[in-house]
């Protein structure tokens, strides 16, 4: 579990410039130095350890925790640590409705499965070069936006977010659905929007990595406890039909921009 030394070495205590702050974060601020707010690491440590246990217990109950972080400093760590603990993630861009309109998102994921099946069974080779190219492009878009959540069959039970200001739509959707939000809170964030806050820097790469690493460790610890009960989850594959193949091909040939359509 995280230590005070970890927090200091990763710069978790460095907040934003004093002119860029949310007054609601005042209780988490230790002081100010050279125009930068300094976060109270004693409180960070306490909240960190409490939240670690919350996430561990959620994983032990078999719950799904969705990792969300799309900015440059977070994307790599979000993907790396979500995969290390076997959880879904969004690290490219949050598409509006990813949780509140999950049925439509699942339909798009199904299209990805259809294209991959066509590649696997060779039916894509029966198409013209242009048709095959358009399907390949569509697959790349689908993978970029939805690859991290392709195995998420239902809405998540909890979300872990890096930068709640940037990911405000994801946080809003979670709040609307009463899905608990876990997130580091920099000095410009609104703590009222987060169920389990951890005051700390959400911009520095090392700080972001530390948060992601600790959440992944908590989840793996919880999963280990669950495995003691001998429970296993089975993923059932749904057969791809010719009708689905034709539908996805027609859609790809229309040259629709998936990202803009879903935004």
From Swiss-Prot:
Keyword Ribonucleoprotein recorded: yes
Compositional bias annotation for Acidic residues: 250-263
GO CC entries: cytosolic small ribosomal subunit
Gene3D superfamilies tied to this protein: Glucose-6-phosphate isomerase like protein, domain 1 (3.40.50.10490), Helix hairpin bin (1.10.287.610)
Residue ranges, annotated region (Disordered): 223-263
NCBIfam families in UniProt: rpsB_bact
Family of this protein: Belongs to the universal ribosomal protein uS2 family.
Name of the featured protein: Small ribosomal subunit protein uS2
């Amino acid at each position: 579990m995280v230590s005070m030394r970890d927090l200091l070495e990763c710069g978790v205590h460095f907040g934003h410039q004093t002119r860029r702050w949310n007054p609601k974060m005042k209780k988490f601020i230790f002081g100010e130095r050279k125009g930068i707010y300094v976060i109270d690491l004693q409180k960070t440590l306490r909240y960190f350890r409490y939240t670690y246990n919350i996430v561990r217990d959620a994983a032990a109950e078999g719950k799904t925790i969705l990792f969300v972080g799309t900015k440059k400093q977070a994307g790599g760590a979000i993907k790396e640590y979500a995969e290390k603990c076997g959880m879904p993630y969004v690290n490219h861009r949050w598409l509006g409705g990813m949780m509140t309109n999950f049925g439509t998102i699942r339909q798009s994921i199904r299209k990805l499965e259809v294209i991959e099946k066509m590649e696997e069974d060779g039916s894509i080779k029966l198409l013209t070069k242009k048709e095959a190219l358009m399907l390949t492009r569509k697959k790349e878009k689908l993978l970029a936006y939805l690859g991290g959540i392709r195995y998420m069959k239902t809405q998540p039970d909890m979300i872990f977010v890096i930068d709640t200001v940037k990911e405000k739509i994801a946080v809003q959707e979670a709040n609307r659905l009463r899905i608990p939000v876990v997130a580091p809170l920099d000095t410009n964030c609104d703590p009222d929007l987060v169920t389990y806050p951890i005051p700390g820097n959400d911009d520095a790469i090392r700080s972001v990595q530390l948060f992601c690493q600790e959440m992944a460790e908590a989840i793996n610890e919880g999963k280990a406890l669950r495995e003691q009960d001998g429970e296993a989850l089975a993923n059932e594959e749904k057969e791809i039909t010719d009708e689905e193949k034709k539908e996805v091909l027609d859609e790809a040939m229309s040259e629709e921009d998936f990202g803009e359509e879903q935004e």
